[in-house]
């Protein structure tokens, strides 16, 4: 799902959902998959509509609309050292953020399908949560 270690971040520290989103989007912005305004789009959308991207207990899929700053299709994966609350009783606290930059609806759907297959394995998720370094996390999510 991830083809380069630059897209993974293991055991990062965030104090709240906003900081978690900012951290999770850093690779997307740093390597050009998204513009800085994309981060603001996710935060503004969350403030307006709530955390619409929480997909399972502990798992968030932060993303904004393509026109909010997506440059090309990419996923970044971030695990948090200490899970944070996003304000959703069913999914809080969140420890895994799969941040998506998608340029159109078709790309978004294909990415969601790949992520669904990825998170379908409890054993894989446990290993991802236990990965203590970027290298260890990349070994689990590459391919």
UniProtKB/Swiss-Prot annotation:
Keywords: Cytoplasm, Kinase, Phosphotransferase system, Sugar transport, Transferase, Transport. The active site is at 63 (tele-phosphohistidine intermediate). It is found in: Cytoplasm. GO terms for biological process: carbohydrate transport; phosphoenolpyruvate-dependent sugar phosphotransferase system; sorbitol transmembrane transport. It comes from the Bacteria. The keyword Kinase applies. The phosphoenolpyruvate-dependent sugar phosphotransferase system (sugar PTS), a major carbohydrate active -transport system, catalyzes the phosphorylation of incoming sugar substrates concomitantly with their translocation across the cell membrane. GO terms for cellular component: cytoplasm; transmembrane transporter complex. This is Putative phosphotransferase IIA component SgcA. Gene3D superfamilies: Mannitol-specific EII, Chain A. Signal peptide: none annotated. GO terms for molecular function: kinase activity; protein-phosphocysteine-L-ascorbate-phosphotransferase system transporter activity. SUPFAM superfamilies: Phoshotransferase/anion transport protein. Transmembrane segments: none annotated. It comes from Escherichia coli (strain K12). The keyword Kinase applies. The EIIA domain is phosphorylated by phospho-HPr on a histidyl residue. Then, it transfers the phosphoryl group to the EIIB domain. Residues 1-143 form the PTS EIIA type-2 domain. InterPro entries: Ascorbate-PTS_EIIA_comp, PTrfase/Anion_transptr, PTS_EIIA_type-2_dom.
């Amino acid at each position: 799902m991830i083809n380069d270690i630059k897209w993974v971040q293991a055991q990062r520290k965030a104090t709240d959902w906003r900081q978690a989103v900012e951290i999770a989007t850093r690779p997307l912005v740093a390597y050009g998959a998204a513009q800085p305004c994309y981060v603001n789009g996710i935060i503004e959308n969350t403030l307006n509509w709530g955390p619409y991207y929480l997909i399972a207990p502990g798992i968030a899929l932060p993303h904004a609309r393509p026109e909010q700053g997506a440059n090309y299709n990419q996923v970044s994966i971030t695990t948090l050292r200490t899970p944070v609350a996003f304000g959703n009783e069913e999914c809080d606290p969140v420890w895994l953020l799969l941040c998506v930059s998608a340029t159109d609806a078709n790309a978004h759907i294909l990415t969601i399908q790949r992520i669904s297959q990825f998170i379908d394995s409890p054993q894989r998720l446990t290993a991802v949560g236990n990965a203590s370094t970027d290298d260890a996390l990349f070994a689990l999510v590459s391919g």
